[in-house]
């Protein structure tokens, strides 16, 4: 068996081999002899089946198994020559050539290896930045919102028209072109005016109504509305206002603080303000990270950390982009690409740069996670999916199973690792204002 190897770079290599017919024949003989011990053939006792019978009954399978064994030998010898461990390979080896003739098989195997990434100066690529400053006014505004959320609605002491901030107790019945639609009606529904709970224009038209008043409210569902049957449609709602309630203002004092800090040792108003300030700082920092610093840091790493990329991983990423593009194309456009290989390749090339950046970013994050000792286990992924599902009013178990069955869990886990590792690196560079 002749073998020739070529290590293209640290992430890609190629193995070329000539497998003599004698090697395949020897493999067939060996596999057939082993089968004589286990094969069940009618008319023969187990373990007593002649090799000639085995070859006749399992002919094509024997050839396939013999060729597969020869390919494994090619791969093992090639890796030994390249001094590459099997564990360093990424994905399955790609057999790009398999030409059979009477006396030999000519084979070319392309392999991809986990790239070598130098992270020696990664911490120096992060510029120190100042922690967001929270003003006293921001703390007081949040404190007032907290107090407002604790207020209770009570019936009006003196009758008046409904205004923003009131809870309007209404019956409503919606129709489109005179036809009632599902989910468009309710009785004695408590609607807080100004909460934007209903579609734009509805609450504004309840403002000014008086108890006992009936009114037809006209609105238009937004084009982006969740129900396709309602999106962009004009609708009319028959509304009856039964009652108006106003919110009783909660005093911001030590008693209020004690209620909000129940279970804590320090129940003072001063501590409540301190905790609100800390919460606002964390929110501002998270916003800064998510909207600016994380993406900028990853872009810096992609630009400055250079290493060889496994070709087949880049091609897979291009395939994803191409499939996404194809889903937006017409049948004629897709047909044209199928019939014109040059045009298809030209389109693939438009995705190459972004694909390379995406693959590079993935390997960098993986290497950084190892360096920073960051990991996300399956339980963390489940908790994240459960939390987001509950936030959206969905069944957490069904949401998790949906992602799992669709094969999305690894991508979610990788996204969480990215978020965690970049946050950890950025946290080490915060400067107090």
Curated annotation (Swiss-Prot):
It catalyses: [protein]-peptidylproline (omega=180) = [protein]-peptidylproline (omega=0). Its EC number is 5.2.1.8. InterPro entries: PPIase_dom_sf, PPIase_FKBP_dom, Trig_fac, Trigger_fac_C, Trigger_fac_C_sf, Trigger_fac_ribosome-bd_bac, Trigger_fac_ribosome-bd_sf, Trigger_fact/SurA_dom_sf. Gene3D superfamilies: 3.10.50.40, Trigger factor ribosome-binding domain, Trigger factor, C-terminal domain. It is an enzyme of class 5 (isomerase). PROSITE patterns: FKBP_PPIASE. Residues 165-250 form the PPIase FKBP-type domain. GO terms for molecular function: peptidyl-prolyl cis-trans isomerase activity. One of its GO terms (biological process) is protein folding. The keyword Transit peptide does not apply. Keywords: Cell cycle, Cell division, Chaperone, Cytoplasm, Isomerase, Rotamase. Its main location: cytoplasm. The keyword Transferase does not apply. It is found in: Cytoplasm. GO terms for cellular component: cytoplasm. Belongs to the FKBP-type PPIase family. Tig subfamily. Involved in protein export. Acts as a chaperone by maintaining the newly synthesized protein in an open conformation. Functions as a peptidyl-prolyl cis-trans isomerase. HAMAP family: Trigger_factor_Tig. Consists of 3 domains; the N-terminus binds the ribosome, the middle domain has PPIase activity, while the C-terminus has intrinsic chaperone activity on its own. This is Trigger factor. It comes from Sulfurimonas denitrificans (strain ATCC 33889 / DSM 1251) (Thiomicrospira denitrificans (strain ATCC 33889 / DSM 1251)). The gene is tig.
């Amino acid at each position: 068996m002749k073998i020739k190897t070529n290590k293209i770079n640290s992430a890609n290599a190629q193995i070329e081999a000539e497998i003599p017919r004698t090697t395949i024949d020897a493999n067939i003989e060996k596999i057939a002899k082993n089968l004589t011990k286990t094969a069940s053939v009618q008319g023969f006792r187990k373990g007593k089946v002649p090799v000639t019978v085995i070859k006749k009954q399992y002919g094509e399978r024997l050839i396939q198994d013999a060729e597969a064994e020869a390919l494994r030998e090619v791969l093992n010898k090639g890796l030994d020559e390249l001094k590459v461990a099997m564990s360093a390979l990424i994905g399955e080896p790609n057999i790009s050539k398999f030409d059979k003739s009477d006396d030999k098989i000519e084979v070319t195997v392309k392999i991809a290896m986990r790239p070598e990434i130098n992270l020696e100066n990664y911490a120096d690529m992060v510029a120190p930045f100042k922690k967001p400053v929270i003003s006293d006014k921001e703390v007081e505004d949040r404190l007032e919102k907290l107090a407002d959320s604790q207020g209770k609605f009570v019936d009006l002491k003196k009758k008046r028209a409904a205004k923003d901030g009131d809870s309007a107790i209404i019956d409503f019945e919606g129709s489109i072109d005179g036809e009632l639609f599902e989910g468009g009606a309710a009785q004695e529904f408590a609607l807080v005016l100004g909460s934007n709970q209903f579609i734009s224009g509805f609450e504004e038209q309840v403002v000014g109504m008086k108890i006992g008043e009936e009114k037809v409210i006209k609105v238009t569902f937004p084009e982006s509305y969740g129900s396709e049957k309602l999106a962009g449609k004009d609708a009319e709602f028959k509304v009856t206002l039964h009652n108006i309630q106003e919110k009783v203002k909660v005093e911001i004092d030590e008693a209020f603080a004690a209620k909000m800090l129940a279970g804590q040792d320090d129940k003072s108003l001063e501590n409540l303000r301190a905790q609100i300030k800390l919460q606002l700082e964390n929110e501002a920092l998270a916003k800064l990270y998510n909207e600016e610093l994380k993406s900028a840091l990853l872009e810096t790493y992609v630009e400055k950390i250079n290493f060889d990329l496994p070709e087949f991983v880049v091609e897979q990423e291009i395939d994803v982009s191409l499939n996404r593009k194809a889903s937006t194309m017409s049948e004629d456009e897709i047909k044209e690409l199928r019939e014109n290989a040059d045009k298809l390749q030209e389109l693939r090339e438009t995705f190459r740069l972004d694909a390379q950046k995406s693959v590079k970013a993935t390997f960098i994050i993986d290497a950084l996670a190892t360096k920073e000792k960051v990991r996300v286990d399956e339980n963390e992924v489940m908790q994240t999916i459960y939390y987001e599902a509950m936030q959206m009013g969905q069944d957490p178990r069904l949401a998790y199973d949906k992602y799992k069955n669709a094969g999305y869990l690894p991508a979610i886990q990788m996204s969480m690792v990215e978020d965690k590792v970049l946050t950890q690196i950025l946290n080490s560079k915060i400067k107090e204002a």
